[in-house]
């Protein structure tokens, strides 16, 4: 394992460190100006740079990101209606707040949003805030404990169906039963002074956030993105996926290119 990590480090770090310079050379020093000028030829240049830098090997699936991104955007618009733009804005920041691309973020959010919105009696604005916090909590938990993010996402999706068997995936000191979730809610109530209802998904997600705040887990993803190689590379991978997806659908090339340069 250590040998493989060392090999990956030697192969990836020089590519990652040189990527920013290559992009700026192709685009000019001002990413905003670069984005304004981004046409087909420029977009092609950036895609070639990503491949040449070795990042393309890691994010090869991102070349098909466009169609998936369009589908995810449609799902968010259907669920969040007048507050869809709020959810999309959160998704654009996911590369650094949750360590995932906007598309991956929206796909996961969509999986539990119907139940979340229902628990808030149709308040899509509040649902967007709680969904965003839940996504950050999942990522922070994964980064803190080294748990597979898919296992944590499965747990959260289970909670949306009142299935608590995977609560222990979060490694917060609670077993995978309804009784243990009720214990978590009571502990969260002691910390926040707010009462949480196990039958209300918004309450469940909020209570988990309170417990993670108390354990010092909150903010781990953003901190690692700013201070560690693995965190910053994960952020760059997500930013690259965002850029390629937006090139494919004619979306926000300017903003996603700027994000990519910032993380490179």
Regions found by a protein language model. Give the residues of each.
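Low-complexity, glycine/alanine-rich, low-charge segments that are largely flexible
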Residues: 1-67, 163, 249-252
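Short, conserved charged micro-motifs
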Residues: 18-22, 85-87, 124-126
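Short N-terminal signal/transit or membrane-insertion segments
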Residues: 29, 121-122
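Tryptophan-paired
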Residues: 107
């Amino acid at each position: 394992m250590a040998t493989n990590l060392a090999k990956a480090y030697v192969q990836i770090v020089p590519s990652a460190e040189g990527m920013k310079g290559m992009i700026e050379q192709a685009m000019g020093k001002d990413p905003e100006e670069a984005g304004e000028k981004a046409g087909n030829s420029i977009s092609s240049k950036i895609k070639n740079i990503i491949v040449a830098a070795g990042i393309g090997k890691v994010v090869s699936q991102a070349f098909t990101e466009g169609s998936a991104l369009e589908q995810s955007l449609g799902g968010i618009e259907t669920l969040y209606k007048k507050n869809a733009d709020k959810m999309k804005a959160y998704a654009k920041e996911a590369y650094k707040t949750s360590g995932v691309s906007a598309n991956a973020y929206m796909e996961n959010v969509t999986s539990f949003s119907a139940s979340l919105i229902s628990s808030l009696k149709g308040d899509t604005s509040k649902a967007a805030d709680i969904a965003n916090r839940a996504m950050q909590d999942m990522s922070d938990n994964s980064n803190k404990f080294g748990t597979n993010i898919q296992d944590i996402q499965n747990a959260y999706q289970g909670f949306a169906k009142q299935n608590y068997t995977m609560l222990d995936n979060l490694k917060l000191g609670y077993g995978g039963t309804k009784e243990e979730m009720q214990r978590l809610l009571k502990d969260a109530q002691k910390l926040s002074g707010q009462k949480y209802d196990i039958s209300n998904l918004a309450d469940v997600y909020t209570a988990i956030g309170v417990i993670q705040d108390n354990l010092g887990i909150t903010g781990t993803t953003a901190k690692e993105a700013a201070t560690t190689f693995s965190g910053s590379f994960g952020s760059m991978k997500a930013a690259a996926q965002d850029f390629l997806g937006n090139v494919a659908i004619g979306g926000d090339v300017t903003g996603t290119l700027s994000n990519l340069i910032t993380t490179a």
